[in-house]
């Protein structure tokens, strides 16, 4: 865990702002074969969630990219270039750093409601960071670009990410929250995100999904 490191992004560059990388595993330059998970944050902790999943086909996806709204905030480690990122839900510890991904022209996937609520959450994060005096790794231009990067999906509808098939399942938790099913040539993965197995007036409960991992 690194602390006390601050990199302010000059115009036209993509450096991350880091007060702390949180609990993470370094992204390797040469990864072994098989399905690999690399946590950019959120390992053994709550908040600043981010995880790269990839396999030998070269397909990879970033699951969530958030920040922990502590004082000072906790940010995840800098993400490698990714074409696709899937957001489970619109809480800031899961989507708070997603606007920074516009540096990589990353497509954002999630439910329609998560995409809609993200504008409110990102605008509020920007406002609070200004009031509290903590710089962000992204600015209003990134926020606007991120809103254009969304590709929303209905629950239980397949979409492709490289060589993989993915679909979203209700997760409970909050309206629009989703579990992510990923079918790879080697295994079926389920990323639960934050779940609730109880029905509520606003969100259907999470139910079991058959998977290998």
Protein language model regions, located:
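His/Asp/Glu-rich metal-coordinating catalytic cores
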Residues: 22, 27-45, 50-86, 91-95, ...
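Short, Lys/Arg-enriched N-terminal segments with co-localized hydrophobic residues
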Residues: 8-15
């Amino acid at each position: 865990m690194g602390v006390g490191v601050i990199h302010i992004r000059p115009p036209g560059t993509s450096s991350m702002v880091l007060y702390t990388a949180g609990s993470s595993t370094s992204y390797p330059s040469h990864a072994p074969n098989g399905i690999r998970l690399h946590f950019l944050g959120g390992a053994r902790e709550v908040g600043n969630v981010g995880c790269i999943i990839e396999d030998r086909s070269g397909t990879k996806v970033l699951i969530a990219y958030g920040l922990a709204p502590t004082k000072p905030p906790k940010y995840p480690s800098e993400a490698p270039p990714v074409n696709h990122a899937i957001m489970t839900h619109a809480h800031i510890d899961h989507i708070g750093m997603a606007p920074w991904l516009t540096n990589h022209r990353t497509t954002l996937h999630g439910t329609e409601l998560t995409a809609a609520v993200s504008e409110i959450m990102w605008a509020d994060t920007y406002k609070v960071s200004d009031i509290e005096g903590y710089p962000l790794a992204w600015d209003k231009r990134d926020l606007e670009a991120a809103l254009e990067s969304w590709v929303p999906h209905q629950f239980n509808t397949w979409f492709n990410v490289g060589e993989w098939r993915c679909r979203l399942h209700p997760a409970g938790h909050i309206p629009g929250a989703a579990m992510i099913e990923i079918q790879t040539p080697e295994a079926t993965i389920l990323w639960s995100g934050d779940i609730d197995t109880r029905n509520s007036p606003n969100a259907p409960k999470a139910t079991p999904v058959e998977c290998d991992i």
